[in-house]
Regions:
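Post-HEXXH active-site segment of zinc metalloproteases
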Residues: 55, 64-69, 81-100
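Short active-site segment of divalent metal-dependent hydrolases/proteases
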Residues: 72, 76-80
Length: 100
């Protein structure tokens, strides 16, 4: 991941932490880029643009790496350590239509 992208994600991490009221070390997350705009989703049938795998791995489609809402959505999964979508996803503005 480029230094510029990492710095941006670190800022987004701090903002989603503040919204959720949960704090954790950004550096615990391992980030992976998957080629294209989406990829076959390993967790369910269909395609993914982003996916969080416990405990601290986030996969994002290469064409989506700058998508703040998607990145923060996956970050929130990591902060919460859960794969479902409780109301905090809506409250923090990172609920995505495809996630429901």
């Amino acid at each position: 991941m480029s230094r510029h992208l990492r710095a941006g994600r670190r800022r987004w991490w701090a903002e989603i932490e503040n919204c959720a009221g949960i704090w954790a070390d950004f550096d615990r997350v391992e980030w992976y880029e998957v080629g294209g705009s989406s990829y076959p989703c390993p967790a369910y049938e269909g395609r993914c643009e982003g996916w969080w795998q416990p405990p601290h791995t986030i996969y994002m489609a290469q064409d989506q790496t700058g998508n703040r809402q998607l990145a923060e959505h996956e970050m929130l999964h990591d902060l919460l350590q859960r794969g479902d979508h409780p109301p905090v996803f809506v409250a923090c503005g990172v609920a995505t239509q495809s996630a429901w």
